[in-house]
């Protein structure tokens, strides 16, 4: 608020700030002179020399000559740097009767803005002869008039001034009169006829004389008027005015017919000799704005006055009686100025558009004038307060419109500025001129992304050149400064092959996958994109793009256990005494996909005898479904289907061989040599087999040592766990050491591998060694069902 008041105050007093604001304006005015009526194109001066500038500086700085009222009396030649006359000058038209005719002007330079004051004096030549208002004048003079009597005559008018103006009057040779040349207060010369010798009507009733007006030119010019003198009979008294000089003041806007003043004269004679009539000694009957009532002496306005053209009138009023005698007085009418002229604004220099980022740019240079006078002529310039512009006075009623500070095109690209010029008259008159200033763009805004980071989702196995998303940036600038180009920035991870993964359309920010993505190889990656405008210098910004690869069900389940090796199938041993729900084994499988594509379910697809075994759907455990009997076949082949939850689902099968035994103790089940894995077998499977064999061998040795020390009943023991035996008849070396026909003890080891395990580590629990009674039968020998499930593989 305070800042606005200060700015407003500055603008109000702007008119009264003097030339101190512009140090570069010269304090002395350069003066030139030229004779009037000189031909157009005549050399006046060389500006480069007179202004003390370098050669070529005037042309490079756009020199121009500015006169008041926007008239171009002179022209500047940019080639020679000379000032030349632009037109013939008529001093009388330009300055009227003013003797000293001086036309002020300014030389305006740009970059930086600079003013030089100068003036052109138009010198008078003797191109006008004196002229009388009438070719003939009539005088009536009584024969008894005494010598020395003075008779005023109508004056001649010469448009020239100084020595070329009217200088003197002469009269043709005669014995009765001579002429005197008198000076008025304002400098004009008028003639007076002086009687030298008495007249005699009877001898010569009339005379004709020639009045000659001469100027001071070389050679002199002259004008003539005939004087006809009638000699009258005796009339003793001459009309006499109450005052020798009357003065009146008339506002220029007085209506026609209004009374200016009333003059009055008396004549002491009687009868017709005492009757007075009034008349004006008029220089120009056509242009004279006054008229007089011949009877009353009232002088009234018959034509409109204009103070700006003529400020005062000098009139001679004549009073004539009936006998022909006359008296004379002078009337000075001063025209009073009325504020009837609005100020004028002349634009000399205007720039649009202007750059937005530079302070105090000169937008316009203009001059103001008012044809009135006094307070009516004083003016104040102003613009709206809410605009970032200032008015600064320079010289001779010149103003500059400058920016107050740097503009911002993005906030406002155009300003409509109304310049108001108001005079100080009553009532105040004003003139307004509107200009439109365009603000040109400068690249001062970097592109801005709509988001600081983008997250894109791409399903794996996509087709190359797939459009995976877009980034977008906008620039508040305009034109070429707002044209945005997109690019990929170097990745922060040097191992990320970004150039082979994605590309970006430089024009619209569309992102494309260059090749098919594999979720199992690359789940996500991120990179930065840049947006650069085309300004100078170019500005840029960047945004982060995260690409998340969505899993597709492109991997089938893989069975880790039992190993699916055609040359060495896995055989599980199950005692016939097993209860329903007895854990036979567990199918362990993994899926390379993720999410629901990796959710596995298990089901029994085929079995030698349906209803004997079942598979738990969620964990792949194979358990007995009922009690076993002697009638059940000893060998069983199970096919377990492992299926994921993808769409469409993928599956794999695992084949199990189950051998039903009546009972066993210290069996020796040699491990067959595994067939060499095919070249394309998974490396993880190889590691699992090697680790399993190593751990099993170590564990077997420990069990043998433990049994030999504690029981001392066996000389040799074999570990039966997750054993692999070839299909076919039960090995002959597995014998019943107790002679009961069954195995008295069962050493079972369960290896479980969970689907989430990726460490290839195996964990083993201690073997289950049930305590059998010495004389127990097969029925009395119970095996804990959970023992098969107490040996997890993770």
From Swiss-Prot:
Keywords: Calcium, Cell adhesion, Cell membrane, Disulfide bond, Glycoprotein, Membrane, Metal-binding, Repeat, Signal, Transmembrane, Transmembrane helix. Residues 1-27 form the signal peptide. Residues 710-794 are cytoplasmic. One of its GO terms (molecular function) is identical protein binding. Disulfide bonds join 95-101. Residues 28-688 are extracellular. Glycans are attached at residues 46, 183, 416, 565. Gene3D superfamilies: Cadherins. Residues 34-132, 137-241, 246-345, 350-449, 454-559, 566-669 form the Cadherin domain. It is found in: Cell membrane. Residues 784-794 have a biased composition (Polar residues). One of its GO terms (biological process) is homophilic cell adhesion via plasma membrane adhesion molecules. It is a single-pass type I membrane protein. Pfam families: Cadherin, Cadherin_2, Cadherin_C_2. GO terms for cellular component: plasma membrane. The chain crosses the membrane at residues 689-709. Its main location: membrane. Residues 773-794 are annotated as: Disordered. It comes from the Eukaryota. Cadherin 1 to cadherin 4 domains mediate homophilic trans-interaction, the interaction with an identical protocadherin expressed by a neighboring cell. This is a head-to-tail interaction, the cadherin 1 domain interacting with the cadherin 4 domain and the cadherin 2 domain interacting the cadherin 3 domain of the other protocadherin. The cadherin 6 domain mediates promiscuous interactions with protocadherins on the same cell membrane. Each cadherin domain binds three calcium ions. Calcium-dependent cell-adhesion protein involved in cells self-recognition and non-self discrimination. Thereby, it is involved in the establishment and maintenance of specific neuronal connections in the brain. Forms homodimers in trans (molecules expressed by two different cells). Forms promiscuous heterodimers in cis (at the plasma membrane of the same cell) with other protocadherins. This is Protocadherin beta-6.
């Amino acid at each position: 608020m305070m800042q606005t008041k200060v700015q407003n105050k500055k603008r109000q007093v702007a008119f009264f700030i003097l030339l101190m604001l512009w140090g570069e304006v010269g304090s002395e005015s350069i003066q030139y002179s030229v004779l009037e009526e000189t031909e157009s194109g005549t050399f006046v001066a060389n500006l480069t020399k007179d202004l003390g500038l370098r050669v070529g500086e005037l042309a490079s700085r756009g020199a121009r000559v500015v006169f008041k009222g926007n008239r171009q009396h002179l022209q500047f030649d940019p080639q020679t740097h000379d000032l030349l006359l632009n037109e013939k000058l008529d001093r009388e038209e330009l300055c009227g009767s003013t003797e000293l005719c001086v036309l002020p002007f300014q030389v305006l330079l740009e970059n930086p803005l600079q003013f030089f004051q100068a003036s052109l004096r138009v010198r008078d030549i003797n191109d006008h002869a004196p002229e009388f208002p009438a070719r003939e004048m009539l005088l009536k003079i009584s024969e008894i008039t005494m010598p020395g009597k003075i008779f005023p005559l109508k004056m001649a008018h010469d448009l020239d001034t100084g020595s070329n103006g009217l200088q003197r009057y002469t009269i043709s040779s005669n014995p009765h009169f001579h002429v005197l040349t008198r000076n008025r207060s304002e400098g004009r010369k008028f003639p007076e006829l002086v009687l030298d010798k008495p007249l005699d009507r009877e001898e010569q009733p009339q005379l004709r004389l020639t009045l000659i007006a001469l100027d001071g030119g070389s050679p002199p010019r002259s004008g003539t008027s005939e004087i006809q003198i009638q000699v009258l009979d005796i009339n003793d008294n001459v009309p006499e005015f109450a005052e020798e000089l009357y003065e009146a003041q008339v506002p220029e806007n007085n209506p026609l017919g209004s009374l200016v003043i009333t003059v009055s004269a008396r004549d002491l004679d009687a009868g017709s000799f005492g009757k007075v009539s009034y008349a004006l000694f008029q220089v120009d009957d056509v242009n004279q704005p006054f008229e007089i009532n011949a009877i009353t002496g009232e002088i009234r306005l018959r034509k409109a006055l204009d103070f700006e053209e003529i400020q005062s009138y000098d009139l001679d009023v004549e009073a004539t009686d009936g006998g022909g005698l006359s008296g004379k007085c002078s009337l000075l009418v001063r025209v009073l100025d009325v504020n009837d002229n609005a100020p004028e604004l002349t634009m000399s220099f205007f720039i649009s558009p202007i750059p937005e980022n530079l302070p105090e740019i000169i937008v316009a240079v203009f001059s103001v004038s008012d044809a009135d006078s006094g307070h009516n002529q004083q003016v104040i310039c102003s613009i709206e307060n809410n605009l970032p512009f200032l008015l600064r006075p320079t010289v001779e009623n010149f103003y500059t419109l400058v920016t107050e500070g740097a503009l911002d095109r993005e906030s406002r690209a155009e300003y409509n500025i109304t310049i108001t010029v108001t005079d100080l008259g009553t009532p105040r008159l004003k003139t307004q001129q509107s200009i439109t200033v365009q603000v040109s763009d400068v690249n001062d805004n970097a592109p801005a992304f709509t988001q600081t980071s983008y997250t894109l989702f791409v399903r794996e196995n996509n087709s190359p050149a797939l459009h995976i998303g877009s980034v977008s940036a906008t620039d508040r600038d305009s034109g070429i400064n707002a044209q945005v180009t997109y690019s990929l920035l170097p990745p922060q991870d040097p191992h990320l092959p970004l150039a082979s993964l994605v590309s970006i359309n430089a024009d619209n920010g569309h992102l494309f996958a260059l090749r098919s993505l594999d979720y199992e190889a690359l789940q996500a990656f991120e990179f930065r994109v840049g947006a650069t405008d085309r300004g100078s210098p170019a500005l840029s910004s960047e945004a982060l793009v995260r690409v998340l690869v969505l899993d597709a069900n492109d991997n089938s389940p893989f069975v880790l256990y039992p190993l699916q090796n055609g040359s060495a199938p896995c055989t599980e041993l199950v005692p016939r005494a097993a209860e329903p729900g007895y854990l036979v084994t567990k199918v362990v499988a993994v899926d390379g996909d993720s999410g629901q594509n990796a959710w596995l379910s298990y089901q029994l697809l085929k079995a030698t005898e349906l209803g004997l075994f079942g598979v738990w759907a969620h964990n792949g455990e194979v358990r007995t479904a009922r009690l076993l009997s002697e009638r059940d076949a000893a060998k069983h082949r199970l096919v377990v289907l492992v299926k994921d939850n993808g769409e469409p689902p993928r599956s794999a099968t695992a084949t199990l061989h189950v051998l039903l035994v009546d009972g066993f103790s210290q069996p020796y089940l040699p491990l067959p040599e595994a067939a060499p894995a095919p070249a394309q077998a998974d490396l993880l499977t190889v590691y699992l087999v090697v680790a399993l064999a190593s751990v099993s061998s170590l564990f077997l040795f420990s069990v043998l040592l433990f049994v030999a020390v504690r029981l001392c009943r066996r000389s040799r023991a074999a570990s039966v766990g997750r054993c692999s035996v070839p299909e076919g008849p039960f090995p002959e070396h597995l014998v019943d050491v107790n002679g009961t026909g069954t195995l008295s003890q069962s050493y079972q080891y369960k290896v479980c591998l969970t689907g989430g395990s990726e460490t290839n580590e195996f964990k083993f629990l201690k073997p289950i060694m049930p305590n059998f009674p010495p004389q127990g039968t097969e029925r009395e020998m119970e095996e804990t069902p959970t023992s098969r499930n107490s040996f997890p593989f993770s």
